[in-house]
């Protein structure tokens, strides 16, 4: 991995923008500890093809074009060495897991409307092709194998899988072949360890959930709690984001931390928050199949939004769920390191800018969309997005079009400002005067990004009014979101830095005026959002 020297090192940094999970560990590996894949042959319909090696990308020079909708048989022969665990795939990680087998085979590059997506692999994001996997894993018989798929021969393998017995202990020979199947997925992950233990939960109207972990008595209760938590999480997930379409999902202790794959994830420990996050990737990466290299915010950000929402509902929390996401984005916006969230994942100047944009700003994009169109319409958008685009590789325009259809508003401006630029939001309460016996309130747009504006007026007698000011670029307005008196004002033209509106009461009756009391608008300076009228 590369490194960038920052002019102002962030907290917990030595001045180098390392990925702390990698740093210089790869350079210190011995020859028998490095990982590699060496493709020996690619044979198509019986004909060997010319190969060009570009490090992590293998180019196959076809002897004959493969035409659209035609079928070919590809025989790919390769050798690989399993590395000492550093990132993603490997053996003997810090938790003592013997094999964490992700990125373990040559994976087909996705060809879409933009052509080939041949991004060199630098242990960040990847974009794959859906297919049907039939995988046979032959390994010493004392190993339990976990994988993202359905086990076809549990009676032969044993180890507590549903339908299994102690056949593995009675079998002759030193090895057993585990037969796995995963259909309509774009990757396949597995892990193996002789001290693995498995527990299962069957979710109502949902999948069979497996939790596979290294047996340590002191941690047993943690893994049981993780399994139990999925029972309460799934109804929230399905109701909000759509049903999980596969028969099984497996949480596997392994790898170097949370990393998502179809039908399974690798996690280090029994963190319920991490587990929920990785499972939610099944909606925004595994089912949608968005090009995560180009649109990481559509996967990591939407997944972070979903994680916060599901965890908060599980805990029966009320109020604002997304404080950490907003804090992450606002810190980035003020740091001087921000780049547009539309930047390719591999080409950010700093890891900090990438992670804060992909996770924090991506989550804020959804939460703030609820502010623009209303949370009730956002809920409809999320389900419509799932129903319209699962298994179809959507891009940002596809999501925006769904949001526009469900809300009846124009929203391309929102993507262009918030994702394609680094312009920030800052609104302030300006002057308050009397005109024709009514209070005339002036608002100012200080930042460069225009937004619709909600204004709460609290009166000295305790009564309140909410005034929502649509942005003219929306060509519409959101419905009322509360039971207090709700007034929709005339639209605010995006070219105008100031806007004024009236309330039917006098200035002396007003106690305070506050912009965006819900805190959903990502205003970089909330100090000027509230004005208290002195007695």
Task: Specify the residue positions occupied by each region the protein language model found.
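Solvent-exposed beta-hairpin/edge-strand motifs
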Residues: 1-47, 101-102, 138, 142-143, ...
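Short, solvent-exposed loop/turn and secondary-structure capping segments
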Residues: 9-10, 53, 84-93, 146-149, ...
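Glycine/proline-rich low-complexity spacer/linker segments in large multi-domain proteins
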Residues: 2-5, 9-21, 79-133, 519-535
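Short, hydrophobic/aromatic-enriched beta-strand segments in well-ordered soluble domains
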Residues: 1, 70-84, 133-141, 178-185, ...
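Hydrophobic alpha-helical and helix-loop surface patches within well-folded domains
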Residues: 1-4, 180, 210-444
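Non-catalytic accessory/interaction domains
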Residues: 151-154, 199, 217, 280, ...
């Amino acid at each position: 991995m590369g490194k960038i020297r920052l002019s102002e090192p962030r907290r917990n940094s030595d001045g180098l923008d390392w990925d702390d999970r990698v740093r210089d560990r790869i350079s210190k590996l011995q020859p028998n500890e490095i990982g590699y894949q060496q493709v020996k042959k690619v044979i198509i319909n019986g004909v060997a093809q010319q190969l060009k090696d570009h490090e992590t990308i293998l180019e196959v020079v076809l002897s004959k074009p493969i035409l659209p909708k035609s079928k070919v048989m590809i025989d790919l022969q390769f050798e690989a060495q399993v590395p000492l665990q550093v990132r993603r795939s490997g053996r003997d990680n810090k938790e003592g897991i013997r094999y964490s087998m992700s990125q373990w085979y040559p994976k087909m590059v996705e060809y879409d409307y933009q052509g080939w997506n041949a991004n060199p692999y630098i242990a960040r994001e990847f974009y794959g092709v859906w297919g049907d996997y039939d995988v046979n894993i032959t390994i010493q018989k004392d190993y339990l194998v976990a994988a993202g798929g359905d086990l076809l021969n549990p009676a032969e393998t044993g180890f507590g899988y549903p339908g299994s017995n102690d056949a593995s202990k009675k079998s002759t020979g030193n090895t057993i072949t585990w037969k796995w199947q995963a259909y309509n997925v774009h990757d396949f992950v597995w892990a193996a360890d002789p001290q693995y233990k498995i527990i299962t939960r069957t979710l109502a109207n949902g999948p069979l959930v497996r939790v596979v972990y290294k047996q340590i008595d002191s941690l047993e209760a943690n893994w049981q709690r993780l399994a139990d938590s999925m029972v309460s999480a799934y109804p929230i997930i399905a109701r909000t984001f759509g049903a999980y379409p596969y028969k099984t999902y497996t949480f596997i202790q392994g790898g170097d931390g949370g990393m998502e794959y179809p039908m399974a994830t690798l996690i280090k420990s029994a963190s319920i928050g991490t587990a929920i996050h990785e499972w939610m990737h099944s909606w925004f990466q595994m089912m949608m199949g968005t090009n995560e290299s180009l649109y990481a915010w559509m996967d990591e950000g939407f997944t972070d939004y979903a994680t916060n929402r599901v965890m908060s509902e599980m805990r029966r929390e009320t109020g604002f769920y997304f404080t950490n996401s907003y804090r992450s984005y606002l810190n980035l916006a003020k740091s001087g390191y921000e780049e547009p969230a539309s930047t390719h994942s591999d080409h950010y100047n700093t890891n900090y800018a990438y992670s804060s944009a992909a996770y924090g700003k991506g989550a804020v994009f959804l939460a703030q969309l609820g502010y623009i169109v209303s949370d009730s319409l956002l809920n409809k958008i999320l389900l419509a997005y799932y129903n319209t685009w699962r298994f179809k590789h959507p891009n940002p325009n596809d999501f925006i079009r769904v949001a526009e259809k469900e809300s009846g508003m124009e929203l391309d401006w929102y993507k262009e400002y918030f994702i394609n630029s680094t312009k920030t939001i800052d609104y302030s309460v300006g002057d308050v005067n009397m005109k024709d016996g009514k209070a005339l309130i002036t608002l100012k747009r200080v930042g460069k990004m225009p937004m619709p504006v909600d204004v709460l007026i609290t009166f000295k007698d305790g009564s309140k009014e909410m005034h929502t000011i649509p942005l003219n670029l929306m060509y519409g307005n959101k419905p009322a979101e509360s039971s207090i008196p709700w007034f929709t004002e005339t639209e605010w033209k995006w070219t105008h830095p100031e806007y004024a509106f009236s309330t039917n009461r006098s200035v002396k009756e007003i106690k305070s005026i506050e912009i965006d009391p819900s805190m959903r608008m990502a205003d970089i300076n909330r100090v000027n959002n509230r004005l208290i009228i002195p007695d």
